[in-house]
Amino acid sequence: MSGLYNNSSYFSPARAASPQIRSTPEIDSSQYLTELLAEHQKLTPFMQVLPICSRLLNQEMFRVSGMMSNQGFGDFDRLRHRSPSPMASSNLMSNVSNTGLGGWNGLSQERLSGTPGMTMDWQGAPGSPSSYTVKRILRLEIPVDNYPNFNFVGRLLGPRGNSLKRVEATTGCRVFIRGKGSIKDPEKEDKLRGRPGYEHLNEQLHILIEADLPASIVEIRLRQAQEIIEELLKPVDESQDFIKRQQLRELALLNSNNLREESPGPSGGGSVSPFNSSGKRPKTGC
């Protein structure tokens, strides 16, 4: 029986929060935080229908990130002193010209803002820099001039926008398509150009990746989103375009499922589960 109670290889939130018990090694906390993030990303499409689960996960993520020592002090200092420089963290992103994308100029421009106070109640160091939420925005230029016939927007969106949704669910970041050609209807884009809120339509086609996450993980997630998007948008020969073939198969599967759903069934009723919601969120400039 003693073996059941003396095993310290599992992370215990109660043990970590107790001042009387030595917390688990940082590597266990890091692994646990990774698992929490994975759960959070799976829950992302259902946050509106499961708000309590989402809130509890967020609380636990902030608590665990607050226990991880010596992480994010640079972000904490910038938050505290309100650095005006948009390039405060020059080492945030590597130069994406090394990715083999000729003409792809990744601009590591970032905007940093912090929320120095949280409404969540958890037992952790209140001044821990890892507990602060940091907002970063990364802009990636799309090389439309070098590849004028390549459908960058359609490739990023994927069937029913699913490719873009998966990027967001995997990384916890939000991705926006901006600039000329970001609106599907050219006539609508011409009408909107110059209006307030659509100034980006005068710019070259580009992508904005937005991360609003704890300081200890925001850079990792932003890099992850950048790598996925660059791989997704890398122009390749059609005969070797595995991503396009995969998207076409997914579209065919979705269309066949729609045909089955539209066919009258014996019960005449569909599922009322909120998880079957097909709500769409616009990702382009419209």
Swiss-Prot record:
What is the protein name for this chain?
KH domain-containing protein At2g38610
Q: Cystine bridges: which residues?
A: none
Matching SMART domains: KH
Native organism is Arabidopsis thaliana (Mouse-ear cress)
Q: Give the principal location in a single coarse category.
A: nucleus
Query: Region Disordered: start and end of each range?
Result: 256-286
Entry's localization field: Nucleus
Q: Which molecular function terms from Gene Ontology are attached?
A: mRNA binding
